[in-house]
Amino acid sequence: MSQTSLHHARLDWNEAGTPVSSEFGDVYFSNDNGLSETRYVFLQQNRLPARFSHHDSDIFVIGETGFGTGLNFLATMAAFLEQAPQSGNGARLHFISFEKYPLTREDLRKALAAWPELATFSQPLIEQWPLPVAGCHRLLFAGGRIRLDLWFGDIKEMLPQVPHPADGLVDAWYLDGFSPAKNPEMWTQALFDGLARLARPHATIATFTCAGFVRRGLIAAGFAMQKVKGHGSKREMLAGERAEKQPQQTIAPWYARPAGRAGEVLIIGGGIASAMTALSLVERGRRVTLLCQDGEPATGASGNRQGALYPLLNGEHDVLSRFYSLAFGFARSRLLALAKRHPVAFSLCGVTQLGYDDKSAAKLAKMAQGPFPPELMQVLSEPEAEQVVGLPCGHGGVSYPQGGWLCPADLTRAAIKEAQASGLLEVVFNTEVVAMAEQADGWQVESRDGRRWQAPNLVVAAGHQLPALIPFAELPLYPVRGQVSHVPTSVSLSKLNTVLCYDGYLTPAHHDHHCIGASYGRNQTDLEFRADEQAQNQARLQACLPQQAWPAEVDVSGNQARVGVRSASRDHLPVVGPVASLAKLADHYAGLQGDQQNAAPLPLHPGLYVLGALGSRGLCSAPLCGELLASEICGDPLPLAADLLEALHPARYWVRKLLKGKPLQ
């Protein structure tokens, strides 16, 4: 699926103060008490209050075909929080919705002002409102008890990309949107079939319309439909239920992501990846034990004073750009939420990337032709770059206005403290894991001093040490040594307004010092200070801005620096997910190139997962990767499209070879 350009909804406002779509000439909600209609049509006809109280699972999943102002979601959230506690601890709501033309934040605020009784719920939605970037945006509410997946883009393109188990995903559908007469492109048989494909057996469905072709289409898709009394003056509407169904799935069997085992999760790590995974797991009620090699968290690659937060985009507008643009939004939301409750040094001052030579300028120019909204990326001329940066650069470039810098160690500690507050996370420091063994019902790990832990599920998120801990996975990852220099500020450097990226990066001042870096030593793991790398960090800035005087004020002579080692992959994407049994893979998929129809699910080491290869963009990718892994282990809806899940799968290197008929070795 390629990345497509979106534009915001164009609104008019009628005499009743109701938003009206300029594209479709239809209201977003009824002039006559839209909230009452929502409660009657969608909550009551899907029997939700009773089902919230007595659901047979710890998670209830609702799907919706048109998000609009979010009124349906907010009313559902209010009802869930009122009813669900009766079903016991751990009851969670997952709401999946689609929107082709997202509102602007200000239009959303104005529309929802009509419902002051929902202000407690609408304010967090407004605060987290995503950028208009195509794909799935995951938002969190009520301390993680409620998750909203907003799929921005045409539902015809998005719906087939929603990953789901073979027996379905959705417990109740809201078939909403502008009326079939005003928006016929949405109300198609392909849509009805897609709703049925994602529906679990006996899932319910409700819609405000009673159009005959809608009823017939839903019946043809596999729903048993009936006419019921409509809301208010509307005579009739439709409600129904999904019958038994044949198993169907979106994800290819060789990229399978089955749910993990019930029970505790062990995590080996101590940096931002393990912290974010632990947080996402405890939000789902899982008990987690985090085994950290060091005496405190974030002493490895996550321990720098300042790190840049911005998406990794390219001119190809491929899975790389799509993943990082979505990960960036989730990372910002996590940062802002955690910083409200824990001390995190950060500044969303923006990031400026310079076209410092012909090659980099051409790369940025190609990237600028892509489907990225100005809220995510803006092209800067040379004068504009100087104004934004605060210092003359001699080059134009691009700005990421919602990016900035943060202290990785602070964010890691904040995520751990937040998870510990639940009472579900135990952190064991000074624990170097040296052995692990697969058992019939889980995994056992052993530390160097002979202590042992056992759990049904094991996550290895140990940075560059990951391949050594699970050598049998043979993941083609490599370590990268990086030295970041800490330099005192100066008269000129103190004027730096944004993070500045060139063939390196320079951060604005924090505690009268800047970070400049970083060196790049592939397949190097030593942590010794190197004077030549200190000099190189300064030299790269001067080489990229040769006509400017202020880079000479960067003083590295104090030899203040920090060295870390990160893990990277050759395709610049993380590895997130289950670990395949490489010993079985070749025989299992011997004929995969010629016979993909009858392929069996990927042979796995049950209960074993990895999260790694975050490279230099861990601040951007770690929160969403941790959320993905927790979703997978718990059997929740996954926060990415199917093709992005394939691109992140740890087995992708081997499966691609087999699909081409090549040997694994």
From Swiss-Prot:
InterPro entries: FAD-dep_OxRdtase (IPR006076), FAD/NAD-bd_sf (IPR036188), MnmC-like_methylTransf (IPR008471), SAM-dependent_MTases_sf (IPR029063), tRNA_MAMT_biosynth_bifunc_MnmC (IPR023032), tRNA_MNMC2 (IPR047785), tRNA_S-uridine_synth_MnmC_C (IPR017610). Residues 1-243 are annotated as: tRNA (mnm(5)s(2)U34)-methyltransferase. Its main location: cytoplasm. It holds the Pfam family Methyltransf_30. Coiled coil: none annotated. One of its GO terms (cellular component) is cytoplasm. GO terms for biological process: methylation; tRNA wobble uridine modification. Residues 268-665 are annotated as: FAD-dependent cmnm(5)s(2)U34 oxidoreductase. Keywords: Cytoplasm, FAD, Flavoprotein, Methyltransferase, Multifunctional enzyme, Oxidoreductase, S-adenosyl-L-methionine, Transferase, tRNA processing. GO terms for molecular function: flavin adenine dinucleotide binding; oxidoreductase activity, acting on the CH-NH group of donors; tRNA (5-methylaminomethyl-2-thiouridylate)(34)-methyltransferase activity. It is found in: Cytoplasm. Its cofactor is FAD. Its EC number is 2.1.1.61, 1.5.-.-. It catalyses: 5-aminomethyl-2-thiouridine(34) in tRNA + S-adenosyl-L-methionine = 5-methylaminomethyl-2-thiouridine(34) in tRNA + S-adenosyl-L-homocysteine + H(+). In the N-terminal section; belongs to the methyltransferase superfamily. tRNA (mnm(5)s(2)U34)-methyltransferase family. In the C-terminal section; belongs to the DAO family. Catalyzes the last two steps in the biosynthesis of 5-methylaminomethyl-2-thiouridine (mnm(5)s(2)U) at the wobble position (U34) in tRNA. Catalyzes the FAD-dependent demodification of cmnm(5)s(2)U34 to nm(5)s(2)U34, followed by the transfer of a methyl group from S-adenosyl-L-methionine to nm(5)s(2)U34, to form mnm(5)s(2)U34. This is tRNA 5-methylaminomethyl-2-thiouridine biosynthesis bifunctional protein MnmC. It comes from Aeromonas hydrophila subsp. hydrophila (strain ATCC 7966 / DSM 30187 / BCRC 13018 / CCUG 14551 / JCM 1027 / KCTC 2358 / NCIMB 9240 / NCTC 8049).
